[in-house]
């Protein structure tokens, strides 16, 4: 796409299996079983240690040497599923594959079918290999695997019986056995595994604007997913759901509304206005709601105004976050991101192009280091493994993973979003006031 530079660099990001951190909380009565090596298990234990010890609804089936020569992994997986069923009684088990499964050519698809028949509840295979996916795309893979559970028609249809008089009815009415379903209506579905409180806030905002029914995919219950068909308007809440959105367009005929993501006051306002325009609602109250939110953020905006900020690329949230920062008055010197889904992010990209923000897809880290030395940004947003070396070199950093786990959508959460950028700047200022520049590691 014009205005986007591609460098074909390596990903510096978490493995997609880490997406279980928020997905196991979103989908109730589920269990996420990751099939991988000891290395994969150690990664999850290190990255999500608190959740592991909290006895969360995810676990590991560790591949051993004997599995390499086994005809099928089904028998060993069945033992693990048996234990999960006894302890958790799940309605669904997601069987997450890793790059090890891809390399060893393990047939988890057929194993999942066999396990589903054997245990009487869905065992769903999910492709979460880190070979060609980034951290947050694990969510996209899980939502895509959930689509077969999404109904195409509302089971609650109004039945209309045609009454007519029969010659031999003796004055009584007889109902025609043929029933007519109710006329289909348009419905709105927000797509993305955000927290329940975030979806409730967005539903409340839309209800205030006159839209009573707002569904969310995924819902917390696998047996109660929203109807999605050709009468459905889909609005994504996250920038990394391209496979799910493409399938809904192609197979369900749903309309995917392209607008800004509801991240920051500006994005939330345009998000609500686009929905109102689609459903013929009055969006005039949105402007005051946006202005009110911006006023509440003014003290934080003052700290960001004029600051030079650079994204190295990690969780695919970089483009909407960069757009929000430009609205705050900051100068984004580079928005690096692993992938750019131009079709679904066309509005976001257009905003950055208007501001002259360089967008770099799949950035080369060595080239980025050279650009860092040349541009000298005030704040660098990067992955955990890169932040510490940059801090040692005298740069101020923000962990990109914090934006993944924080609630950053909607007007209410805008204060938490902006604080994630302001906090490291305030920390650096406090260190400078304490004379830490004398240590030589901070320039």
UniProtKB/Swiss-Prot annotation:
UniProt cofactor(s): [4Fe-4S] cluster
SUPFAM superfamilies for the chain: Helical backbone' metal receptor
One Pfam family recorded for the sequence: Oxidored_nitro
Phosphoprotein recorded as keyword: no
Catalytic activity: chlorophyllide a + oxidized 2[4Fe-4S]-[ferredoxin] + 2 ADP + 2 phosphate = protochlorophyllide a + reduced 2[4Fe-4S]-[ferredoxin] + 2 ATP + 2 H2O
GO biological process entries: light-independent bacteriochlorophyll biosynthetic process; photosynthesis, dark reaction
Keyword field: 4Fe-4S, ATP-binding, Bacteriochlorophyll biosynthesis, Chlorophyll biosynthesis, Iron, Iron-sulfur, Metal-binding, Nucleotide-binding, Oxidoreductase, Photosynthesis
Keyword rRNA-binding tagged: no
Enzyme Commission no: 1.3.7.7
Record note on cofactor: Binds 1 [4Fe-4S] cluster per heterodimer. The cluster is bound at the heterodimer interface by residues from both subunits.
Pathway entry: Porphyrin-containing compound metabolism; bacteriochlorophyll biosynthesis (light-independent)
GO molecular function: 4 iron, 4 sulfur cluster binding; ATP binding; metal ion binding; oxidoreductase activity, acting on iron-sulfur proteins as donors; oxidoreductase activity, acting on the CH-CH group of donors, iron-sulfur protein as acceptor
Enzyme's top EC category: oxidoreductase
Annotated binding of [4Fe-4S] cluster, by residue: 15, 40, 99
PANTHER family the record matches: LIGHT-INDEPENDENT PROTOCHLOROPHYLLIDE REDUCTASE SUBUNIT N
Record-stated family: Belongs to the BchN/ChlN family.
Role, per record: Component of the dark-operative protochlorophyllide reductase (DPOR) that uses Mg-ATP and reduced ferredoxin to reduce ring D of protochlorophyllide (Pchlide) to form chlorophyllide a (Chlide). This reaction is light-independent. The NB-protein (BchN-BchB) is the catalytic component of the complex.
NCBIfam families membership: DPOR_bchN (TIGR01279), PRK02842.1 (NF002768)
Subunit structure: Protochlorophyllide reductase is composed of three subunits; BchL, BchN and BchB. Forms a heterotetramer of two BchB and two BchN subunits.
Protein name as catalogued: Light-independent protochlorophyllide reductase subunit N
Organism: Heliobacterium modesticaldum (strain ATCC 51547 / Ice1)
Taxonomic lineage: Bacteria, Bacillati, Bacillota, Clostridia, Eubacteriales
């Amino acid at each position: 796409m014009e205005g986007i530079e591609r460098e074909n660099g390596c990903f510096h990001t978490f493995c997609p299996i880490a997406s279980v951190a928020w997905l196991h909380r979103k989908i109730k009565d589920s269990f996420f079983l990751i099939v991988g090596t000891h290395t994969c298990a150690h990664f999850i234990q290190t990255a999500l240690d608190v959740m592991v010890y909290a006895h969360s609804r995810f676990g590991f089936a560790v591949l051993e040497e004997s599995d390499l020569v086994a005809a099928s992994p089904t028998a060993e997986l069945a033992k693990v599923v048996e234990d999960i069923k006894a302890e958790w009684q799940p309605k669904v088990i997601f069987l997450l594959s890793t790059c090890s499964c891809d390399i060893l050519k393990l047939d988890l698809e057929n194993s999942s079918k066999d396990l589903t028949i054997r245990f009487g509840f869905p065992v769903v295979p999910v492709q979460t290999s880190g070979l060609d996916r980034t951290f947050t795309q694990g969510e996209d893979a899980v939502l895509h695997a959930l689509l077969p559970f999404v109904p195409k028609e509302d089971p609650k249809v109004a039945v209309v019986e045609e009454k007519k008089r029969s010659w031999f009815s003796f004055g009584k009415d007889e109902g025609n056995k043929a029933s007519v379903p109710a006329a289909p209506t348009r419905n709105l579905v927000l797509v993305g595994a955000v927290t329940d409180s975030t979806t409730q806030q967005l539903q409340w905002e839309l209800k205030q604007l006159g839209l009573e029914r707002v569904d969310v995919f995924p819902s917390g219950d696998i047996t109660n997913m929203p109807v999605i068909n050709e009468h459905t308007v889909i609005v994504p809440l996250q920038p990394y759901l391209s496979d799910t959105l493409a399938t809904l367009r192609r197979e369900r005929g749903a309309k995917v509304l392209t607008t800004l993501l509801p991240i920051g006051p500006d994005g939330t306002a345009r998000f609500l206005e686009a929905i109102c325009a689609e459903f013929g609602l009055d969006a005039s109250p949105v402007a005051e709601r946006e202005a009110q939110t911006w006023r509440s953020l003014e003290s934080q905006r003052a700290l960001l105004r004029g600051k030079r900020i650079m994204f190295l690329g990690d969780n695919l949230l970089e483009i909407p976050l960069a757009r929000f920062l430009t609205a705050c008055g900051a100068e984004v010197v580079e928005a690096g991101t692993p992938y750019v889904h131009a079709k679904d992010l066309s509005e976001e990209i257009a905003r950055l192009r208007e501001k002259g923000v360089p967008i770099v897809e799949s950035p080369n880290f060595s080239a980025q280091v050279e650009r860092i030395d040349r541009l000298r940004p005030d704040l660098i947003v990067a992955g955990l493994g890169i932040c510490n070396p940059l801090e040692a070199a005298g740069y101020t950093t923000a962990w990109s993973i914090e934006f993944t786990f924080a609630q950053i959508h909607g007007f209410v959460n805008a204060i938490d979003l902006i604080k994630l950028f302001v906090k490291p700047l305030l920390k650096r200022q406090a260190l400078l006031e304490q004379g830490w520049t004398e240590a030589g590691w901070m320039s």
